Amino acid sequence: PANVKHWHGAARDSWFAHLAIEVPAQGASNECCGPVSDEEYGMCKSRVEPAMESGHPGKISPTPVSGLEQSDPEFVQIFESFAFDEVVNQGDLDERTRFMAILAALLGCQGVDEFNVMLPAALNLGVTPVEVKEILYQATAYLGIGRVYPFLTDANEILEGQGYGLPLKAMATTTKEDRLEKGNQAQVDLFGPHMKGFYLSGPEESRHINKWLADNCFGDYYTRRGLDDRQREMMTFCFLAAQGGCGPQLASHAAANIRIGNDRQFLIRVISQCL
């Protein structure tokens, strides 16, 4: 088609150079370019689709263990058979929800390499760039910028590599003036009426933390468009479960999930897919 530019050529283990082919509105021309690096080639290969490979209907390519076929073939067979056959066929969680949960869990456990493998598959299966960014942004409130930043920069590279322009459309719904009020209302909606004015409670020396919870975590993030309340609570549930050491917080958010419609069976299906 007109105005399309792409490149093609030999595999990365070949000495052949790749070609960039430009197709202007009128006519066509070829431009000889230098070899494509392994990194560029890998980015292209990461645009994956579900494949009926090795009898595993849920398998993607590459997988989180791609690259180990020569050194650890038995492990690869065990892992792929379990993850892409046994696990994906357990329960009836839709693919979009499954991949959103997996991305959140990989953030929680700091699996950045695996995140980079799974993100293109998630995009291919219908998870939108906006949803990806909202998962990443919300993770900051629970995991901290030190843990989220590498995921965010890698996600930006993947999104741009697939042709998505950045920044994406703004999703904020609050202002500096109303973020506390709306954040506290989000707490009430999720956890119950006892959260009304919770940011005013607690010892004076640490009360500011309750305020930050209301205005930043809930006012800045939970009120954003792009994910609904049920999706956001599922994300938080996955962040906390994968991070570990957050038992009380995990129990609290499990209750919040159930309160807004993510019932016990749904949470079991979600956590099963994150295993």
Question: Where do the PLM segments sit?
Answer:
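Winged helix-turn-helix DNA-binding recognition segment
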Residues: 127-131
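Preference for long, well-ordered alpha-helical segments
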Residues: 147, 249, 264-275
